[in-house]
Regions:
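Histidine/acidic-residue-rich catalytic or RNA/ligand-binding cores of hydrolases
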Residues: 12-15, 47, 136-142, 164-170, ...
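Acidic-and-aromatic substrate-binding clefts and catalytic sites of carbohydrate-active enzymes
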Residues: 10-16, 39-47, 70-78, 102-107, ...
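Active-site gating/metal-coordination segments in enzymes
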Residues: 31-32, 46-125, 172-175, 189
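Histidine-centered catalytic micro-motifs
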Residues: 1-11, 127-131, 156
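Catalytic pocket-lining loop regions of alpha/beta-barrel enzymes
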Residues: 104-199
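Mid-to-C-terminal alpha-helical segments outside catalytic/metal-binding sites
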Residues: 2-4, 15-36, 120, 195-196, ...
């Protein structure tokens, strides 16, 4: 079983080490994780590389690293960052952009193009955060998925639901992950014919910000149990076996 949306590093509730994250995922029964570092948002690129190296040391090929891109990485005063991370001997298996955290992606399409060209060069999927704000609603990415139809995109969180459904219906290169999604939304999308394009994800350990009295392992176990109960065996096993990052 793979958690297709996990994190490590600095976040508003403190620091989540590679060991903490990997142990929690394993305790919950997760075998592989697709993971990006929230330390990227503090532009701590060297720390990100150290974190990923340590996580890979712990988990080996069961770790699927995602390169979180920020606009600053493409600015002239910080252009060393991407080459540094690319040549870090980490085999990045996806790139991520968070348009709400970094609104410049929304306003600067040349910058976005450069980031997507990097994804094309790396030959990896692109993960977009989606949410209920104008910069990151799912339909914002419909044009991107259509224009860059040679790339594969993942809409993290699937928000808003109807817009996510519209993107999936019109863009065969679009997937979504279930991180922090209501399970009834997951079921609705699966029953609409998109089960093969739904990736299981948890957003762990960000859950600790919202569920302070529950461990990450317990949160994941509860989420998996709810998925199984609500989806039923067939849809549950289909979604849990989907794998995009390799």
């Amino acid at each position: 079983m793979t958690d297709n949306h996990a994190h490590l590093g600095w976040y508003s509730d403190g620091y989540h080490s590679p060991k903490e994250v990997w142990q929690a995922e394993q305790e919950a029964g997760i075998e592989e994780i697709v993971v990006s570092s929230t330390s990227t948002c503090a532009e701590k690129y060297k720390l990100v590389v150290r974190e990923m190296r340590e996580l890979i040391r712990l988990g080996g090929t069961r770790i699927h690293p995602i390169l979180w891109l920020t606009p600053r990485m493409f600015h002239s005063n910080c252009r060393w960052a991407i080459p540094y991370m690319i040549h870090s001997k980490i085999r990045w298996q996806g790139v991520k952009m968070h348009w709400l955290a970094h609104k410049e992606w929304y306003h600067n399409r040349k910058l976005l193009h450069n980031a997507l060209e990097l994804a094309h060069w790396l030959d990896v999927p692109v993960l977009f955060h989606t949410g209920d704000f104008k910069e990151c609603k799912a339909n914002v990415f419909k044009e991107v998925c259509t224009k860059y139809d040679h790339l594969t995109f993942v809409l993290a969180h699937g928000r808003p639901l109807n817009e996510t459904k519209d993107v999936l219906a019109n863009c065969s290169n679009a997937y979504l992950d279930t991180a922090f999604m209501p399970v009834d939304h997951v079921k609705e999308l699966a029953e609409a014919g998109f089960a093969q394009r739904i990736l299981y994800g948890t957003d762990a350990p960000i859950n600790q910000l919202f569920y302070e009295d529950m461990s990450t392992a317990e949160y994941i176990k509860n989420n998996i149990s709810e998925m199984r109960n609500v989806l039923g065996n067939d849809l549950y096993h289909t979604i849990m076996s989907n794998q995009l990052y390799k």
